[in-house]
Amino acid sequence: MAGEITETGELYSPYVGLVYMFNLIVGTGALTMPKAFATAGWLVSLVLLVFVGFMSFVTTTFAMEAMAAANAQLRWKRMETHKEEDDEDSSTASDSDLLSQDNYERAEKRPILSVQRRSSANLFEITDRVEMGQMASMFFNKVGVNLFYFCIITYLYGDLAIYAAAVPVSLMQVTCSVSGNDSCGVDTDARYNDTDLCWGPLRRVDVYRIYLAIFTVLLGPFTFFDVQKTKYLQILTSMMRWIAFAIMIVLALVRIGKGQGEGHPPLANFLGVQNLFGVCVYSFMCQHSLPSLITPISSKRHITRLLFLDYALILAFYGLLSFTAIFCFRGDSLMDMYTLNFARCDVVGLAAVRFFLGLFPVFTISTNFPIIAVTLRNNWKTLFHREGGTYPWVVDRVVFPTITLVPPILVAFCTHDLESLVAITGAYAGTGIQYVIPAFLVYLCRKDTQLTFGYGTVNKHRSPFRHTFWVAFVLLWAFSCFFFVTAYIVLKETQL
């Protein structure tokens, strides 16, 4: 989230963009969804998943409309700059020319109707990659910009804490099982405690923290440097992810087909809705990365239809993954990281496949952690940046990376409850990024567009949900979710 206009990059077709967006949305959250489904009940989970997916689609169209409006503003400013330069070149005009110039200046104060008639469609073409931070600075006031960065930073901290916990948890589960009496893999029927022994005198929690320390030492230093994910690394991790998902779905279907399915999920259990909601919101998170995905698409003529198709496919995939999981495994045996349910001999006979699935999150998450850390560091720098100012070397190279790295590692040190981490991150910061920010962006950009270009201007990428009712509905849903989750957590804590 650099907060500025960046290079568009190499263009790609709409269908390639569809694949990129699918890969962006379907990530770590999908691995925690089966357990959340089993806890909340299959009917409640299905209804909430579809509704959250629909709301995410609505706000995605909001964000795309705001991107088009931002492009129009930037394009109009460039046109204004060129006109001013032309005016300076014609400073020796005659009296009649001056009169014409006076008429022109008066016309400039009115909405640009001539521009609307000539090229209003092209005016809103999305060609410049305007990041969310830049859009916030264009349409929000100073308080709004600061709240935007606070929300983004909180979400990225949650992301890093989830990643920092997921890798050591996977390593602990696999290696403790292999080194113990059950050398055949993770025993999901056994109820392990953090105080159970793993290696000799070392408890499971000790092994987890050792892995966390190794993870921090190996990947933490990247926070102090600039790093980006190469195309080939992205292709490799994407292939690993889809191979893993395909194996899990096929194996679960085979077990169910053979009559070995152990799952009997309830229809509804409202006590599990809080975690499910956070997981669902987290699993549809993409709005903060839309400028990087949408802008390079070569033809955006039917982009809204493609987005709808993408969301339908993602819903189908989440449903397939979660329903095969909850009917294949008992609810109390489903683990926070669904991949660990397949690290058992009775589920997967081939040792190589067991280790691949058990350690799959380690490889994919480890490649993402430095990227997110650098993004968070840059957001901190942007938040405190002042025009024309520079940071001292110590602040730039030591302080910002340190405040980026330390908090999520401390959170991961204190807890490795991945389902709760995902739920809290999604329910709070995720609600802000996915609902509140796009809703305010589209509302304010519409007002700004009307003031600048006139009330008859039509944004070619405007959302199908163009009525103000939808903005109010999204905000009402967001604040209702926020208060519901907060009340649930408070009531749960007071009962302990």
Curated annotation (Swiss-Prot):
Annotated TM spans: 11-31, 37-57, 147-167, 205-225, 234-254, 266-286, 307-327, 355-375, 398-418, 422-442, 471-491
Q: Which residues lie on this side of the membrane: Cytoplasmic?
A: 1-10, 58-146, 226-233, 287-306, 376-397, 443-470
UniProt-listed InterPro entries = AA_transpt_TM (IPR013057)
Its subcellular locations are: Membrane
Question: Which GO cellular component does the record give, naming just one?
Answer: membrane
Please report a single Pfam family linked to this protein.
Aa_trans
Report the membrane topology from the UniProt record. Answer: Multi-pass membrane protein
Enumerate the residue ranges of region (Disordered).
Answer: 81-100
Q: Where is the composition biased (Low complexity)?
A: 91-100
Residues bearing attached sugar chains per UniProt: N193
Q: Which UniProt keywords apply?
A: Glycoprotein, Membrane, Transmembrane, Transmembrane helix
| Stretches assigned to the Extracellular side | 32-36, 168-204, 255-265, 328-354, 419-421, 492-496
Question: What's the chief localization of this chain?
Answer: membrane
For this protein, the record's Gene3D superfamilies field holds: Amino acid/polyamine transporter I
Q: Which family does it belong to?
A: Belongs to the TMEM104 family.
Q: What is this protein called?
A: Transmembrane protein 104
Please name the source species. Answer: Mus musculus (Mouse)
Identify the coding gene. Answer: Tmem104
